[in-house]
Curated annotation (Swiss-Prot):
It comes from the Eukaryota. Keywords: Blood coagulation, Calcium, Cleavage on pair of basic residues, Disulfide bond, EGF-like domain, Gamma-carboxyglutamic acid, Glycoprotein, Hemostasis, Hydrolase, Hydroxylation, Protease, Repeat, Secreted, Serine protease, Signal, Zymogen. It is found in: Secreted. The keyword Transferase does not apply. The gene is F7. This is Coagulation factor VII. GO terms for molecular function: calcium ion binding; serine-type endopeptidase activity. The lineage of its organism: Eukaryota, Metazoa, Chordata, Craniata, Vertebrata. Residues 1-21 form the signal peptide.
Length: 444
């Protein structure tokens, strides 16, 4: 039995060897199948400068390997930020259905229409209140307890279906400049002392108040029957007989054919105005015959008080216009001049006034605008003219040229009557019955 066992063992060994031969192949064959294609630098790889393609793109690399490529720690760090950045959108940071775009060490969320914020976390509807960017309204905004704010439009406009925009319903809505809209031009800048000519038709609400043939003051057309100006213009006026208002005027030395001359039926000033003083310096004039609205004669919008104080007052630059002196104690302008002036902080204006002996007090019924370097300012003859502010392409009356220390004097700025304080007073009078002559009306 023993020889037979040895024979079986030998057969098994031979069979196993044959099986192994079937499994294992030669070294050359194995290299041709399994061996990775050797890099170009072969065994000299560690002796040659690093390659970005070889070290970090064909396979993952370490910071040290990248450092070999750039030969600079700073450049390596810059590369490493991008290379080792990862997917910043992996945590789904965008909320409320927003989509995420991966950036270097950052991300951008693209929000759905009703949401905003870095992560689309803010619902726009929750922020639709009037104190926040005027509630998104083009003109007037009203807050409501327990419900969303609503937008409204000035007379002569109507609200569009989107609930925020206003479109004109009349041929000549207030605050628009037909001359500019027909040309598709932008609003000009410039003015008075240091200013530029306001091209014909681009200040269509400007009025020239004439005492006989002499320019008395400027004014602003508010509608077809009313012009607003400064009360101090009439300190020495005892009768309306020689007082006229010229609308559509541009060049005082020429008759251009667009002028409209109107007599004044009624002059109204606040009962608190004291001649020779600067407070409550505003006056309302009723035309004896209504103005005819044209491309060169358009009223300026009288804004609601809240809108004026919360929205318009935050706009830095406004336009002032008039035919005042081009230089202090110089000649009056022949053509209508205009300029954009920056509004100043009330506290800064008050402090400047307090530091100048004999300077009138700046009250809450006034505000300041202009350039402290004395480069641009209103001057004698501009008094009563408009300080107009544009919001979403519509112009509003925000001030009346009142007083200043000289004209364009260094360290001095123009002082304007704050029209928002008189909005209700003006509106009430514009609805009143006609009473001829010069009157004082209780304020407020």
């Amino acid at each position: 039995m023993a020889p037979q066992a040895r024979g079986l063992g030998l057969c098994s060994l031979l069979a196993l060897q044959a099986s192994l031969a079937a499994v294992f192949i030669t070294q050359e064959e194995a290299h041709s199948v399994l061996r990775r294609q050797r890099r170009a630098n072969s065994f000299l790889e560690e002796l040659r400068p690093g390659s970005l393609e070889r070290e970090c793109k064909e396979e993952l690399c370490s910071f040290e390997e990248a450092r070999e490529v750039f030969q600079s720690t700073e450049r390596t760090k810059q590369f490493w930020i991008t290379y080792n950045d990862g997917d910043q959108c992996a945590s789904n940071p965008c909320q409320n259905g927003g989509s995420c775009e991966d950036q270097i060490q950052s991300y951008i969320c693209f929000c759905l229409a009703d949401f905003e914020g870095r992560n689309c976390e803010k619902n726009k509807n929750d922020q639709l209140i009037c104190m926040y960017e005027n509630g998104g309204c083009e003109q007037y905004c009203s807050d409501h307890v327990g419900s969303q704010r609503s937008c409204r439009c000035h007379e002569g406009y109507t609200l569009l279906p989107n609930g925020v925009s206003c479109t004109p319903t009349v041929d000549y809505p207030c605050g628009k400049v037909p001359a500019l809209e027909k040309r598709g031009a932008s609003n000009p800048q410039g003015r008075i002392v240091g200013g530029k000519v306001c091209p014909k038709g681009e200040c269509p609400w400007q009025a020239a108040l004439m005492n006989g043939s002499t320019l008395l003051c400027g004014g602003s057309l508010l509608d077809t029957h009313w012009v607003v100006s400064a009360a101090h213009c009439f300190d020495k006026l005892s009768s309306l007989r020689n007082l006229t208002i010229v609308l559509g005027e541009h060049d005082l030395s020429e008759h251009e054919g667009d002028e409209q001359v109107r007599h004044v039926a009624q002059l109204i000033m606040p009962d608190k105005y004291v001649p020779g003083k600067t407070d409550h310096d505003i006056a309302l004039l009723r035309l004896l015959q209504p103005a005819a609205l044209t491309n060169n004669v358009v009223p300026l919008c009288l804004p609601e008080r809240n809108f004026s104080e919360s929205t318009l007052a935050t706009i830095r630059f406004s336009r002032v216009s008039g035919w005042g002196q081009l230089l202090y104690r110089g000649a009056l302008a022949r053509e209508l001049m205009a300029i954009d002036v920056p509004r100043l902080m009330t506290q800064d204006c008050v402090e400047q006034s307090e530091h100048k002996p004999g300077s009138p007090e700046v009250t809450g019924n006034m505000f300041c605008a202009g350039y402290l370097d004395g480069s641009k300012d209103a001057c004698k003859g501009d008094s009563g003219g408009p300080h107009a502010t544009s919001y979403h392409g519509t112009w509003y009356l925000t001030g009346v040229v009142s007083w200043g220390e000289g004209c364009a004097a260094v360290g001095h700025v123009g002082v304007y009557t704050r029209v928002s304080r008189y909005t209700e007073w003006l509106s009430r009078l514009m609805r009143s019955k006609l009473h001829h002559g010069i009157q004082r009306h209780p304020f407020p």
